[in-house]
Amino acid sequence: NHIEATNNNSVDVSKNPIVVYQGFSIHGNEASRSNAGLAAAYYLAAANGNKIDDLLNNTIILFDPSFNPDGLQRFAYWANTNKANTINPDPNDREYHEVWPGGRTNHYWFDMNRDWLPVQLPESRARIESFHKWLPNILTDHHEMGSNSSFFFQPGIPSRTNPLTPQMNQD
């Protein structure tokens, strides 16, 4: 029904479930996002009550726990190999400074966040194939940022739109 509704104005979409695609850690060294994704999936599977029942009865939730599994594995290996027995909060500690190529990139040393449009890599092709199959109403792309440099991007706010973005991309 969801795909039919995209091409048919006579379909009553209010009776269809909303499709949500949640993607995490496109940069493998942003590991807290993949961990948050697993916690969110667990919550959705384990929670009880009318609110969660209503959400799950009216929503199709697609999880991609790691857009970049190769980078996440590389980062996890680095962090686990270089961590101290006692957590070291010093930002200059070796654990927090990966050597090249680090976990940001995938197996081919490519920044997966730059492959949304060209769709050259296997991970991106699989992701786009899933998008074409489900046509999600909502897509989330969870990133990790420094504690003093976070921001929230909300499409549709005129003051947040780059003036070089063509109007057709905004419509």
Predicted features and spans:
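Surface-exposed loop and adjacent secondary-structure segments within mature catalytic domains
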Residues: 1-2, 7-17, 37-40, 53-119, ...
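Short HxH-centered metal-ligating active-site micro-motif
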Residues: 11, 16-32
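Second-shell loop/turn segments in exported
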Residues: 23-30, 113-117, 166
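Short amphipathic alpha-helical face segments that pack within enzyme cores
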Residues: 35-43, 126
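Sec-exported extracytoplasmic/periplasmic mature domains
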Residues: 42-49, 117, 132-136
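Proline-aspartate-enriched helix->loop->beta-strand connector
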Residues: 131-145
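Short, intrinsically disordered, charge-balanced linker/junction segments flanking boundaries
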Residues: 167-171
